């Protein structure tokens, strides 16, 4: 087991979970469209305004996990059409950001989303080159769905006046597989 106090000293030293904290989970259909995202942010805003303590976990946008699986599979099969799926998913996230975020927030979010998608594209290209998608590689590919939706929705929450921050779970959770 890694010592997270040493690896993430600020986080480990400053983070404690209040006993009255709620953990809310929203699945893919709940975050499937900009309209649904707006609706769930309104729900979260009411919790926030009531002084509720909560953490939120978001799934990938509806259909994105399946698209990511298909991208990885196509890349491993040497099928360059993985790039078409990649571009569709990338554009869907950028369009959602443009629809959900006002100019200042959009300008902050777009570079992060683009960076995430460039990393995904490089990963898929590596899979394409070696014609192999290991379980670990596919786990990494799939992580982009939740990471991108969570990042984007955190920005929408901030824009709505909720004191929210995106937390990349890879920095605080260690798995054994």
Where in the sequence are the language-model features?
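Nucleotide/pyrophosphate-binding catalytic subdomain
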Residues: 4, 8-177
């Amino acid at each position: 087991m890694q010592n997270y106090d040493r690896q993430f000293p600020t986080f480990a030293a400053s983070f404690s979970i209040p006993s009255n904290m709620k953990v809310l989970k929203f699945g893919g259909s709940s975050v499937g469209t900009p309209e649904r995202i707006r609706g769930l942010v309104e729900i979260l805003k009411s919790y926030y305004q009531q002084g509720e303590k909560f953490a939120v976990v978001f799934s990938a946008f509806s259909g994105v996990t399946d698209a990511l699986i298909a991208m990885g599979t196509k890349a491993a099969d040497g099928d360059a059409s993985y790039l078409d799926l990649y571009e569709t998913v990338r554009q869907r996230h950028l369009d959602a950001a443009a629809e959900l975020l006002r100019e200042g927030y959009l300008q902050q979010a777009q570079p992060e989303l683009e960076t995430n998608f460039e990393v995904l594209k490089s990963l898929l290209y590596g899979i394409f080159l070696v014609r192999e998608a290991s379980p670990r590689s596919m786990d990494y590919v799939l992580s982009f769905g939740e990471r991108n939706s969570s990042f984007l929705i955190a920005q929408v929450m901030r824009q709505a006046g909720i004191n929210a921050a995106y937390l990349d779970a890879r920095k605080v959770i260690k798995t054994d597989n």
